[in-house]
């Protein structure tokens, strides 16, 4: 989950004011995803990525995986204060919600402008990256 892209979209398209990581829509998104998957016992790894500062990372302490740049990692390593876990797996596991139909899924995606735009952009970028990789591999043979 590229939380920076979520934040950037909100800053460019809304009048959202961010006082700290708890107000960051990207941090809130990773937190919601983590809590949903753990509460329903989905067997997957939730990984947050694309951080700008240590506060965003600290707000997601306890997430299954975080990709952290070397600069931010050095800053975190130099800070000897306690880092309390912020994301804690659910103790009470709930039955998974019923699966959405394709139509319900598409409607839910279309109800959120940020999701609609960023999902489409992400798919296009991954497809372009795959094509470039395939061309590189083909050129080597």
Predicted regions and their residues:
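Short, small-residue-biased leader/transition segments that mark boundaries at the very start
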Residues: 1-2, 126
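Catalytic alpha/beta core domains of metabolic enzymes, predominantly
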Residues: 3-91
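C-terminal extensions of enzymes
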Residues: 87-141
